[in-house]
């Protein structure tokens, strides 16, 4: 599942959904949560089912359900699982136990609907308050987990602060949680996906945040407008010279499988360099062969 560009749209906004489905997004997230008013939850759920029922293979369809502590959570799952979304996005995920509950509910509904157990993947939008940062051990929780997603806006609301300074950089508590999520994703061996840039009319701000995300090790970025997709995709696609370096590192270690340290173009490389090279080649494979 390619996760460089994930585009949110309200499930009940027909025009926005149509535009999203025609976009170059890797995945379209049909939102049943924040962008849908309480009075419109049932209608949005029905709209999501309609989209899923008529889905083609491109882009992948993900449904952001409502949080587990709401009355809409189970009805959302009951409605969408029979129509086989590529993944379910769990918002406000505050602990591994939340993923275990979702995994249990998905398996029960898959079996009830004659679907293979484990068919539907999970994306977790992690909202970590100061009290729950110590609980970010997501490794081994469920094989459905495909990525951890960072949500700066939800977290800032929990803290009662602004997520960003005037210059666009993240405020200290948000930056700390972002770093913790990167570590948690690495431990769980899943990609980390960065928070959306909130202003589609500010391409300079978007570019600055994308550059930081790439530098810090995120694998993709959430988007809230189609015009954010191209710059995000371009930034997360490894440049040709980086790909050539990765291919050379990989080839050198394949030729010398018992070596721990080698020399490439006069520079020492070791096993951590091989891991980095493999990540780069995996990103290239996802770009050229979307699974």
Predicted regions and their residues:
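Expand to "…catalyze enediolate/carbanion chemistry for C-C bond making/breaking, isomerization
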Residues: 1-291
């Amino acid at each position: 599942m390619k996760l460089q560009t994930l585009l949110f749209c309200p499930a009940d906004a027909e025009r926005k959904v149509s535009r999203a489905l025609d976009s170059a997004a890797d995945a379209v997230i049909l939102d049943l949560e924040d962008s849908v008013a309480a009075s419109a939850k049932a209608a949005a759920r029905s709209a999501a089912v309609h989209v899923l029922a008529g889905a083609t293979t491109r882009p992948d369809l993900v449904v952001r359900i409502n949080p587990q502590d709401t009355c809409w959570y189970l009805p959302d799952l009951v409605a969408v699982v029979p129509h086989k979304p590529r993944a379910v996005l769990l918002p406000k995920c505050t602990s591994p136990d939340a993923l275990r509950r979702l995994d249990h509910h998905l398996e029960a509904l898959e079996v009830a609907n004659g679907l293979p157990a484990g068919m539907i993947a999970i994306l977790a939008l992690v909202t970590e308050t100061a009290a729950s940062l110590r609980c970010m051990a997501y490794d081994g929780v469920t094989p459905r987990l495909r990525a951890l997603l960072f949500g700066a806006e939800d977290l800032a609301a929990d803290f009662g602060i602004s997520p960003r300074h005037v210059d666009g950089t993240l405020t200290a508590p948000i930056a700390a949680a972002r770093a913790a999520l990167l570590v948690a994703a690495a431990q769980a061996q899943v990609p980390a996906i960065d928070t959306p840039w909130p202003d589609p009319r500010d391409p300079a701000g978007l570019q600055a945040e994308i550059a930081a995300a790439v530098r810090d090790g995120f694998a993709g970025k959430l988007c809230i407008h189609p015009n954010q997709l191209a710059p995000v995709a371009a930034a997360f696609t490894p440049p040709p010279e980086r790909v050539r370096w990765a291919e050379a590192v990989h080839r050198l270690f394949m030729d010398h499988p018992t070596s721990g340290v080698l020399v490439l173009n006069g520079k020492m490389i070791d096993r951590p360099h091989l891991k980095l090279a493999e990540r780069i080649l995996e990103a290239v494979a996802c770009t050229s062969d979307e699974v």
